[in-house]
Structure formats: C-alpha cells, structure tokens
C-alpha cells in the first residue's frame, strides 16, 4: 500500500520575483536561494573598470532587496565581451567579493545584448 502524502509534505515554497520589466525579473527567490539575473552597466561608454563597478553596485542593490548580500554568494558567472577584459574585471571583482566567502565562479566570453556593454555578471545567493 502506498503511503498517502499529507498537505505539508507536498507544498512547495512560494516563488518571489523582484520585477524588472514585463519580460524579466532582476531576481527570482525560491526555497532560500536568490537567483539574480545578469546585471549590465548603466553606461556603455564607460571603461571596463567603470562598467564592472557599475555592475557590482547593481548586484549589491539587488541582493539587498532580496534580503541577502555578497557574503552569501553561491555562484557567479562573469560574462565579458572580450577575453582581454578578464584581468581588469577580475581586479574589481577581487576587491568587491569577500576573500573569505568566495562563490564558485566562472568566466565566459560572450556576445552581450548591447554592443557597448563589455561586462555582465549573474549570481545566485543564499537568503
């Protein structure tokens, strides 16, 4: 005989979305994890270092809205339009991420949505 499932064991945690616009969310929170959409810089004409700092500042803000911080990062994916930018991006990243709480991180060369964007970062964090 199959055991019956009671209501409390079959309920799933709610999904919370931090809206960005109609087609995407800045973050989706589920089961104690915040999945942050890839953030892009505000100024596409800025230097790589400035674009990176802009993205890191945006990540701080989105993480705070989700009730977490960079200290609880689980993973990070850094997208660069050109592999020659990795060293400059990594300098800013290393200054920003807590050295004693680093996430699993990967760097990817990718064509970004807007040609002037040189950097984009996507993260997931524990709540």
Language-model features and meaning:
Residues 1-74, 80-127:
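N-terminal presequence-like segments and the immediate start of the first folded domain
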């Amino acid at each position: 005989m199959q055991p019956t499932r009671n209501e409390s064991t079959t309920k799933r945690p709610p999904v919370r979305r931090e809206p960005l616009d109609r087609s995407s969310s800045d973050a989706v929170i589920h089961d104690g994890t915040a999945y942050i959409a890839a953030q892009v810089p505000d100024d596409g004409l800025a230097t790589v270092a400035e674009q990176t700092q802009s993205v890191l500042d945006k990540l701080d803000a989105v993480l705070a809205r989700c009730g977490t911080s960079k200290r609880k990062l689980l993973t990070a994916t850094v997208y660069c339009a050109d592999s020659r930018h990795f060293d400059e991006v990594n300098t800013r990243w290393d200054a920003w991420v807590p050295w004693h709480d680093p996430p699993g991180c990967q760097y990817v060369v990718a064509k970004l949505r807007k040609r002037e964007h040189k950097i984009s970062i996507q993260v997931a964090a524990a709540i």
